Each structure stands twice: as structure tokens, then as C-alpha cells.
């Protein structure tokens, strides 16, 4: 089953609103795996901080992940592909849609992301990059 969540942003202080919680808790269960794809592959500190904050938002609604991976320039293209193949959830992070898509294409992840079943979450740029056309 293919499920896409698209957010303009997630409030890292307040977390998910009640409507978001309802659907997220229906689809995302404890001990799933999640793989984040950065929009800015060279911004390591930013990426690490955002992943920790987003994982905490899920923890606040009692969802804990068995594995958390982050794809940016510290990860080889081969490992990035393996993470996507095996993960339950892909999370496309916010930032620059153009740079995120450039990195997705450079890492040869476009087809596997497009064709995979599972849950894909995107905020801002990550939401835009889930669509066929952004104007």
C-alpha cells in the first residue's frame, strides 16, 4: 500500500495536531523503520538536528522507531539505496526542493522512491517533491 503525507511544516514544539495524530497513528506503528532524505546534503549539523526533532515529535505520540537512517553526503549511494529498499517510511525533509531533487537524482533514488510501496512523508520541499508537477 502506498501512503503519502504532505505537510507544509511540522511544529516541532507543539507536534502533530489532533487530525494529523489520528491518521498517523493509524498508519505508523511502533518499531517501524524510517529513513530521512535531506534536502541539503552538505548541511550535516542542520540535518542531524532536524532528524532528532522530528523523531521526538513522533515519540510524543508514542511512536518509536526501531531504525532511523539519514541520507545525506555522509552516506554512500549504495547504502542510501539499501536504506530505501528496506525502510517502512521515507521522510523527505524540508529545505530546497531543487537541491533535494538534484541529490535524489544524483543518488539514483528517483525511481525507487516513485515506485516503492509504503509510507512517504514530506515537509515543505519534501512535500513538493512527492508530486508530479510543482508550479
Model segments located where?
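Extracytoplasmic mature domains of secreted/periplasmic and thylakoid-lumen proteins
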Residues: 83-84, 92, 96-97, 109
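Glycine-rich nucleotide phosphate-binding loop and flanking beta-alpha elements
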Residues: 12-13, 43, 97-98, 127-129
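N-terminal beta1-alpha1 cap of cysteine-dependent amidohydrolase-like domains
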Residues: 1-89
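Proteins with a high burden of low-complexity, intrinsically disordered sequence enriched in S/T/G/P/A and R
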Residues: 5-9, 19-22, 96, 103, ...
Amino acid at each position: 500500500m502506498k501512503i503519502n503525507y504532505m505537510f507544509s511544516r511540522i511544529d516541532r514544539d507543539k507536534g502533530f495536531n489532533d487530525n494529523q495524530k489520528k491518521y498517523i497513528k493509524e498508519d505508523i506503528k511502533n518499531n517501524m523503520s524510517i529513513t530521512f532524505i535531506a534536502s541539503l546534503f552538505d548541511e550535516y549539523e542542520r540535518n542531524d538536528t532536524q532528524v532528532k526533532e522530528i523523531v521526538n515529535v513522533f515519540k510524543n505520540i508514542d511512536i518509536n522507531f526501531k531504525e532511523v537512517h539519514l541520507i545525506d553526503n555522509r552516506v554512500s549511494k549504495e547504502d542510501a539505496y539499501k536504506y530505501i529498499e528496506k525502510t517502512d517510511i521515507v521522510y523527505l525533509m524540508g529545505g530546497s526542493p531543487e537541491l533535494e531533487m538534484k541529490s535524489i537524482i544524483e543518488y539514483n533514488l528517483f525511481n525507487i522512491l516513485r515506485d516503492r510501496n509504503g509510507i512517504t512523508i514530506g515537509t515543505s520541499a519534501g512535500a513538493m517533491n512527492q508530486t508530479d508537477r510543482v508550479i
